[in-house]
UniProtKB/Swiss-Prot annotation:
PANTHER family from the UniProt entry: EF-HAND SUPERFAMILY PROTEIN, MYOSIN LIGHT CHAIN 1, 3
GO molecular function, one term: dynein heavy chain binding
Chain positions recorded as Ca(2+) 4 binding sites: D147, N149, D151, E153, E158
Pfam families with a match to the protein in the record: EF-hand_7
GO BP: any one term: cell division
Binding locations of Ca(2+) 3: D111, D113, S115, T117, D122
Binding site for Ca(2+) 2: D74, D76, S78, T80, E85
Protein name in the entry: Caltractin
Keyword Cell cycle part of the UniProt annotation: yes
Miscellaneous comment text of the record: Binds four moles of calcium per mole of protein.
Amino acid sequence: MSYKAKTVVSARRDQKKGRVGLTEEQKQEIREAFDLFDTDGSGTIDAKELKVAMRALGFEPKKEEIKKMISEIDKDGSGTIDFEEFLTMMTAKMGERDSREEILKAFRLFDDDNSGTITIKDLRRVAKELGENLTEEELQEMIAEADRNDDNEIDEDEFIRIMKKTSLF
């Protein structure tokens, strides 16, 4: 367990921030989704087509999210997105999804009883396995820092929030 925990954390530290690299297979999937929804062959897709294309790639974007994405990506103000813009956007989205999955892997290393929360007992065990000699007060402070709903435990959302806040992921 301690080896796995160290591996997950060090792998994330070593990974470059920002744009993640996509495999050729992922790029091909993105190209196929784009082409499928570029029904008129214009080389661009509009907001409605974007939503359908993203769903085909496994995302569930909300209307506001689509509008925001288009305004950030559509630099020429045409209201449409070309393939390069779509690829840039989907690369970022896939990076966010990968980051979340990595954080949840780390969460599961702490939550070895699969309760869905990290307790002070879980934190104490991991600290000991990693050779960290933390006091009860320090452990409690760590829980308190992440705990948003005052239940003295850290759930998945709280863990994701604190990991992103501390830039460990």
